[in-house]
Amino acid sequence: MLLLVLSTQHFFDRQIQENERNYLQVAMKTVRNDMENRMDEMRKAGLLFAGDSDINKAMYDDRNRLAMALNNLKRNFNYLDYVVIVDRENRILASSSPYLLYPDGSAVKILAASSMLFGKTHVSEEVVGLEELFTKDSFEYDNFSIKILNQFPGAQEYLHKALMGIVVVPIRDKSADNDVIGAIVLCDVLNNDNYFAERYSRNMDNSFLAFSIDGIRIASNIQTDTKSNFVGSRAPHETGKYLEDDKQYFGKVDVDDEIHVFLDQKIFNSADEPIAVVGIGIPEEKFSGIVSNNYKYVLGLFFL
């Protein structure tokens, strides 16, 4: 009898773990689909902008017209945090903020140059230093900086890196053999942005999402009974345990005295380098409660 109970318990333990993994695998696909849909929307917006005949004419001598068009674009797509229009020499003609930077050698500028050189739309996820994007002490720079939690008393350490989706669309002169005469660059910064996390949790009950750079959470809606803000906290597990085959890691972690099962997946940039992590998790008791009822039901049948 004891052997049967133990074997049944072992079976249900394995079932729980398998269900957890399968659930999170499916959930991860919904997150990545949402992210890809956002990038595709940015791409389509860039293509419409670049294909506008008025924009085409304004590229030569009407910066005011470009600035007005860019402001309209921002109003329609208010999640865009960094937008520039550049000429064929990769010089700024209009930008979404007076505090926006576009220095030589920056990742964004290099990607824009490549897009114009090959005449192809570029879409990728990148991690870029905030000093390449905005002037220090600007609202944008401060808003996207992540204060690292649980430091020594008096310490004020920040993460000054941004995870963002970037789209570059070449602008062509329709009256001159379709030559590339510039580009529009659109970026959506994920730091301190709960759009994907909130959307995810609406679709997946009792489940949470977080993005992290260098092991620091930059956006998160993780909640426990005692804590509701985990932005700036460190991911407690070792990223070196990732499975290289599928570039992800499944495991359990103690989140503020609450055990969560989680699935982490690496995010790669245009150079196919791992730059960040997207992680999803759910309190283990949410799974355990469901399967525990099945376990009790089976034992009940045996003793009838």
What is each stretch, according to the model?
Residues V167, I181-L190, V261-S288:
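Short, hydrophobic beta-strand elements of compact beta-sandwich sensory domains
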Residues I171-A176, V253-H260, I267-S270:
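Sensor-regulatory modules in signal-transduction proteins
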Residues A58-D61, S96-P103, K174-L186, N192, ...:
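Membrane-proximal N-terminal soluble sensing/regulatory segments of transmembrane proteins
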Residues G279, E284-L304:
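Cytoplasm-proximal transmembrane signaling helix
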Residues V86-A94, G215-I218:
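Short, glycine-anchored, charge-dense loop/turn motifs used at functional sites
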Residues M1-N64, N71-D81, R88, H122-G129, ...:
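Juxtamembrane extracytoplasmic/periplasmic/luminal helical "stalk" adjacent to the first N-terminal
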Residues N64-L70, S96-E157, D193-D205, N221-V255:
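Extracytoplasmic/periplasmic sensor domains and loops in membrane signaling proteins
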